[in-house]
Swiss-Prot record:
Residues 134-261, 270-384, 378-506 form the Thioredoxin domain. Its EC number is 5.3.4.1. The lineage of its organism: Eukaryota, Metazoa, Chordata, Craniata, Vertebrata. The gene is PDIA5. It is found in: Endoplasmic reticulum lumen. Keywords: Disulfide bond, Endoplasmic reticulum, Isomerase, Redox-active center, Repeat, Signal. Pfam families: Thioredoxin (PF00085). This is Protein disulfide-isomerase A5. PROSITE patterns: ER_TARGET, THIOREDOXIN_1, THIOREDOXIN_2. It comes from Homo sapiens.
């Protein structure tokens, strides 16, 4: 009997310990739920919810410890819940929410719900930083450090981290200051991280997202005026920016063998200073010029515009040809709209290049002209251009063109909707429109499916496009009965779209078949 006491005590401790540990580690900010009605109510009242479903209480322990710290960091911005599917009371809830923890190696699932509906399964890195970043921007891109290829880049999160690295690092240090939305940064990141791996042990390459206003001091100190800005340091001392050099991994590695200050940029000679037969007009002399010349074709341009640069030689050749004619049919002129803003505003110039024709001082519309031949043909016989082609929205197609006012109500009526957010001027959008239109026509007889489009340039749609986290064109989102389900990132072709939608319908048929079997 003398030995029975300790054995009984040990058993009691073993039984109580898991429960005691969990209660000590789980934050009060994590809501434990077992009743389907409670979860339904919570999803109705909170618009950003991450739910941990676990096979048992023990299986959830590590995640709960991590999520307790996350809950504190996102307090007021997101909600974290826990459902123990091993608990008899919670099994019904897990089944209702389609949580499958039957595989032996699957102990937990993390599901995210937004605006009352399922958004996505959390499949990013299970770390404090990644989950916090996700809950602060559920539709945003993953952190750079989540990329397995970026393991050799030092990722800095705070000014304290930045100052500490400058103080301790003895090796040459190259830091990329970036913003998560910056497309040029995204294009350069794979090269930067490849260079970091190649230079491991010889130099340190670091990355720091300084888009937030909390980093204004750093941006001011190192002249970060745009993204990416790459700065070079030696023994904690800033020397110069990596600028006007190549952006490939090979370029970076080669440059770090012998770091040099930025190469001086050779300023472009303004078109007006190049000479030639094109007349360059200003706010001050424009009106007088078009009065004195009975036939004038004017090109409104911007120095940075690639299409303008491509068109300029053809425009110059046409001007020279007209200049050499004994009985010239007119003259060609140009206006730098970035300098002569009064003229640009007066003639509603919103894109470049834009052509305007003036006959005896009166303005006329001009069709699309881009070559010397077309310019000369037009000047010899200026005529009213053919009516413009109907816009996508004006064409008779099966695509639903939505605006902010009817967006939600229309989508709620369709089980599956693929929405294309676009801008009419966007070349990538123009390329994909025929494919998207053909897809809509292919499914026009299926009442549960729709292909819809939103013109984000329209004033009435700009708030909607911002709410839907549209950061580039075209962007494709899939909605299930009006609720955002996922972003479409597959092939932007008719085949890609139709395969995606067919897979959705096949899933419907499979679920319907299973229900019939159960009945």
């Amino acid at each position: 009997m003398a030995r029975a006491g300790p054995a009984w005590l040990l058993l009691a401790i073993w039984v109580v310990l898991p429960s005691w540990l969990s209660s000590a580690k789980v934050s009060s900010l994590i809501e434990r739920i077992s009743d389907p009605k409670d979860l339904k109510k919570l999803l109705r009242t909170r618009n950003n919810v991450l739910v941990l479903y676990s096979k048992s209480e023990v299986a959830a322990e590590n995640h709960l410890r991590l999520l307790s710290t996350v809950a504190q960091a996102v307090k007021g911005q997101g909600t974290i819940c826990w459902v123990d599917c091993g608990d008899a009371e919670s099994r019904k809830l897990c089944k209702k929410m389609k949580v499958d923890l039957s595989p032996k190696d699957k102990k937990v699932e993390l599901f995210h719900y937004q605006d009352g509906a399922f958004h996505t399964e959390y499949n990013r890195a299970v770390t404090f930083k990644s989950i916090v970043a996700f809950l602060k921007d559920p539709k945003g891109p993953p952190l750079w450090e989540e990329d397995p290829g970026a393991k050799d880049v030092v990722h800095l999160d705070s000014e304290k981290d930045f100052r500490r690295l400058l103080k301790k690092e003895e090796k040459p240090l190259l830091i990329m200051f970036y913003a998560p939305w910056c497309s040029m940064c995204k294009r350069m990141m794979p090269h930067f991280q490849k260079a970091a791996t190649q230079l491991r042990g010889h130099a340190v390459l670091a990355g720091m997202n300084v888009y937030s206003s909390e980093f204004e001091n750093i941006k001011e100190e190192y002249s970060v005026r745009g993204f990416p800005t790459i700065c070079y340091f030696e023994k904690g001392r800033f020397l110069f920016q990596y600028d006007n050099y190549g952006s490939t991994a090979e370029d970076i590695v080669e440059w770090l063998k012998n770091p040099q200050p930025p190469q001086p940029q050779v300023p472009e000679t303004p078109w007006a200073d190049e000479g030639g037969s094109v007349y360059h007009l200003t706010d001050e002399d424009f009106d007088q010029f078009v009065k004195e010349h009975s036939s004038v074709l004017v090109m409104f341009h911007a120095p940075w515009c690639g299409h303008c640069k491509k068109m300029k030689p053809e425009f110059e050749k046409a001007a020279e040809a007209l200049h050499g004619e004994a009985d010239s049919s007119g003259v060609l002129a140009a206006v730098d709209a970035t300098v002569n803003k009064a003229l640009a505003e007066r003639f509603h110039i919103s894109e470049f290049p834009t052509l305007k024709y003036f006959k005896n001082g009166e303005k006329y519309a001009v069709p699309v002209l881009r070559t010397k031949k077309k310019f000369l043909e037009w000047m010899q016989n200026p005529e009213a251009p053919p009516p413009p082609e109907p816009t996508w929205e004006e064409q008779q197609t099966s695509v639903l063109h939505l605006v902010g006012d009817n967006f939600r109500e229309t989508l709620k009526k369709k089980k599956h909707t693929l929405v294309m957010f676009y801008a009419p001027w966007c070349p990538h959008c123009k390329k994909v429109i025929p494919h998207f239109t053909a897809t809509a026509d292919a499914f026009k007889d299926d009442r549960k499916i729709a292909c819809a489009a939103v013109d984000c340039v329209k004033d009435k749609n700009q708030d909607l496009c911002q709410q839907e986290a549209v950061k580039g064109y075209p962007t494709f989102h899939y909605y299930h009965y009006g609720k955002f389900a996922e972003k479409y990132d597959s092939d932007r072709t008719e085949l890609g779209f139709t395969n995606y939608i067919r897979a959705l319908r096949e899933g419907d048929h499979e679920r319907l078949g299973k229900k019939k079997e159960e009945l």
